[in-house]
From Swiss-Prot:
The keyword NADP applies. Binds 1 FAD per subunit. PANTHER family: THIOREDOXIN REDUCTASE 1-RELATED-RELATED (PTHR48105). This is Ferredoxin--NADP reductase 2.
Length: 368
């Protein structure tokens, strides 16, 4: 599935939002905030309990940080999957949740959350989509995330034209004179990827020390020795332009000397600045911009609101996709009594349960 044109997801978004913006709220059982891997797996775990979910995300595509920041980088710590990219993980999760028919509401944030007298929540998004829901699952990763920007007066006018903080189409930089700024894994990874494809690559970092894999640093230094690229210790302090086109940047080195480098594109990787956004105003118990939860149900201090994935915190928390999947399973069971208060939930297994096979749309195996 090409998530740059997410047809089935887009269709559910349009159909749902067209019917609710300014009209009657959708009355639902579960609302998931965040369409990254953990949010998608939350759909699956709820679906096994016959709970249909609606999913909101501020991005216009499904996949969260995996698709937005590293769609082509391999992930090695998903159980039984030796290696997959962020895009492949997202595609597989979308396939896995197909039987449950989730409805996606993309390109919008939750703006209002109010507790109703009947115990349910009224929720409204930034686009006016409204819900009345029994439960809320916050799977928003680090919240809304923004790249830390290059602090040079006036250079922001080239943002998205010749100044980039993310790489979505690597081929766009082939045959170009590139300056890559930063000292972390992203800066090193893209430097190594683009050397030999770009016309020239100059990497700039404020010091001769890196927060990246040692093998990547060693490879970069080897390429410098082979005259395949350059590395400069320094900081960008200015630029030159001609007819509205960025033509040079000015780099001041540790020796105090300012050098001028011809450039077609500047790629900046200073990391991300996470922002909780409207979630910070919901009355949740927060600790250092993360939501405190229990470890039995991964419920917040507000009954009926759960938090899973990187956005939550508890003693021993590890920010792993694997951990988020575990949290989603327990959160689904924790939410079931709010949705089916009279129903006793029995533990069933997808290997043996005819009921789950029916829910999943698969045939029950027959054993001799």
């Amino acid at each position: 599935m090409d998530l740059s044109i997410p047809n089935p997801v887009a269709d559910t978004t349009k159909a749902a939002d067209a019917g609710t913006a300014g009209g009657q709220p959708l009355e639902i059982d579960a609302l998931i905030v965040g369409a990254g891997p953990v949010g998608l797996f939350q759909v699956f775990e709820l679906g096994l309990l016959e709970i249909k979910a609606h999913v909101i995300d501020s991005l216009k595509v499904v996949g969260g940080q995996c698709v937005e920041l590293y769609p082509d980088k391999p992930i090695y710590d998903i159980p039984a999957v030796p290696s997959c990219t962020g895009q492949e993980l997202t595609d597989n999760l979308l396939k896995q949740i197909e039987p449950f028919g989730p409805t996606f509401h993309l390109g919008q944030e939750v703006a209002v959350v109010e507790r109703r007298d009947d115990g349910r929540f009224f929720v409204e998004t930034s686009l006016g989509t409204r819900f009345i829901t029994k439960t809320i699952f916050i799977a928003a990763g680090v919240g809304s995330f923004q790249p830390r920007t290059l602090k040079v007066d006036g250079i922001d006018k080239f943002d998205g034209k010749q100044l980039f903080y993310r790489v979505k189409d690597p081929s766009r930089f082939h045959g170009r004179n590139l300056v890559i700024v930063g000292g972390g894994d992203s800066a090193l990874d893209w430097t190594l990827d683009l050397v030999g494809k770009a016309e020239s690559v100059v990497m700039i970092h404020r010091r001769d020390g890196f927060r990246a894999a040692p093998a990547s640093v060693a490879k970069m230094k080897e390429l410098c020795e082979q005259m395949e690229m350059q590395f400069l210790v320094g900081q960008i302090g200015g630029y030159e332009e001609k007819d509205g086109v960025l033509t040079e940047i000015k780099v001041t080195g540790a020796d105090g000397v300012t050098r001028r480098l011809p450039v077609d594109d500047v790629l900046v990787f200073f990391g991300l600045s996470p922002k909780l956004g409207p979630i910070a105003e919901w009355g949740l118990d927060l600790e250092r911009k993360q939501i405190k939860v229990d470890t039995e149900k991964f419920q917040t201090n507000i009954p009926g609101i759960f938090a899973v994935g990187d956005i939550n915190t508890y003693p021993g928390k590890k920010k792993l996709i694997l951990s988020g999947f575990h949290e989603a399973a327990l959160a689904a069971f924790g939410a079931a009594p709010y949705i089916f208060p009279e129903k006793k939930i029995h533990m069933q297994y997808t290997t043996t349960s005819p009921k789950l096979h029916k829910v999943l749309g698969v045939e029950s195996p027959v054993f001799d």
